[in-house]
């Protein structure tokens, strides 16, 4: 049975609109200095081995050498730091293709669409769920993409230690070019190069996760915020593609059936939006619907000046471990 968490309340709100502005991203290198957190004017606890990354080969701590240009473990496994500031910790055996993750076109389309503010409602709703996290809490975005939601969180809570991973190298590179402090790595959400019990809160926005792997890296009673599509999500777009639309079923089944997590609460966010001009094509290309649309449907959508659609998100809050009755 879902319970409310007093210090981390999920408000029930359907159709609510949020008006506070989100930061517009700047294409600059992240100011994060791995692995030390660099935000100012906040008291810091010492950085321990659990606050960094572990070697994906042997599981020992990665430490900087060569003026921080390379990270190496005691067994001499080494990983070069990209010029943008991120690490690539994705091993070949954890890849299913040469370039895993979303295509470059999908990622850049999503970046343009999100930067235009169409999902501002969702970003604000996520931010509403984290005020109880204490300074220096470590928040992980699993499938962070090009960093839109992490940057929004940093704007609201610059006292948190932010960590973002994505299996797409292109996405992580774009995230690293945003001007906000975060530990960023190319990594698999199913084989996280993070220490056990090292994360206070994890979020996942439309990204697949491994319940057991997230439970491993979360601290006891740590929190997981999962975002999935509501039944009417993008119904205005799918009406142009399918004759018979099937409501979204969400992506929570594995978590709801997991012994590792307890559901604490959930909320639906629903809003009607009007998408303009080239953003319509970006929306189509950033979703799997692009591959379901015929060439004629893609062309027809590309000619639209305006698209009216619902955006509908289901946000669920889980706690790591069972909750006493």
Each model region followed by its residue ranges:
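Conserved SAM-binding loop of SAM-dependent methyltransferases across substrates and taxa
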Residues: 146-158
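Class I SAM-dependent methyltransferase Rossmann-like catalytic core
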Residues: 96, 101-121
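Conserved class I S-adenosyl-L-methionine
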Residues: 136-145
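Conserved SAM-binding strand-loop segment of SAM-dependent methyltransferases
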Residues: 180-192
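Conserved beta-strand signature within the Rossmann-like core of class I S-adenosyl-L-methionine
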Residues: 222-232
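Conserved SAM/SAH-binding beta-strand->alpha-helix loop
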Residues: 166-170
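Conserved Class I S-adenosyl-L-methionine
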Residues: 50, 269-325
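N-terminal auxiliary segments of SAM/dcSAM-dependent transferases
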Residues: 30-99
């Amino acid at each position: 049975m879902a319970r409310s968490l007093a210090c981390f309340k999920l408000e029930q709100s359907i159709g609510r609109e949020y008006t506070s502005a989100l930061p517009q991203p700047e294409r600059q290198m992240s100011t994060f200095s791995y692995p030390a957190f660099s935000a100012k004017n906040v008291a810091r606890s010492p950085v321990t081995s659990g606050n960094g990354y572990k070697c994906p080969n042997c599981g020992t701590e990665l430490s900087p050498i060569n003026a921080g240009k390379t990270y190496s473990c005691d067994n001499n496994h080494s990983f070069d730091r990209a010029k943008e500031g991120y690490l690539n910790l994705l091993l070949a055996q954890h890849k299913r293709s040469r370039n895993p993750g979303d295509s470059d076109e999908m990622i850049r389309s999503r970046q343009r669409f999100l930067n235009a503010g169409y999902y501002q409602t969702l970003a604000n709703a996520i931010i509403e769920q984290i005020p109880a996290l204490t300074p220096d809490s470590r928040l992980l975005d699993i499938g962070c993409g090009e960093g839109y939601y992490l940057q929004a969180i940093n704007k609201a809570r610059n006292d948190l230690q932010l960590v973002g991973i994505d299996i797409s190298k292109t996405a992580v590179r774009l995230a690293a070019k945003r001007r906000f402090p975060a530990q960023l790595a190319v990594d698999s959400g199913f084989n996280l190069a993070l220490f056990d019990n090292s994360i206070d809160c994890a979020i996942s926005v439309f990204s697949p996760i491994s319940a057991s792997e997230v439970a491993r890296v979360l601290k006891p009673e740590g929190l997981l915020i999962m975002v999935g599509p509501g039944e009417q999500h993008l119904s205005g777009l799918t009406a142009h593609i399918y004759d018979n639309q099937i409501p979204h079923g969400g992506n929570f089944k594995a978590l709801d059936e997991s012994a590792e997590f307890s559901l604490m609460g959930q909320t639906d966010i629903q809003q009607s939006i009007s998408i303009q001009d080239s953003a319509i094509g970006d929306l189509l290309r950033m979703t799997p619907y692009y591959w379901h649309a015929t060439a004629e449907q893609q062309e027809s959508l590309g000619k639209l000046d305006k698209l009216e659609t619902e955006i509908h998100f289901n946000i669920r809050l889980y706690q790591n471990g069972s909750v006493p009755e």
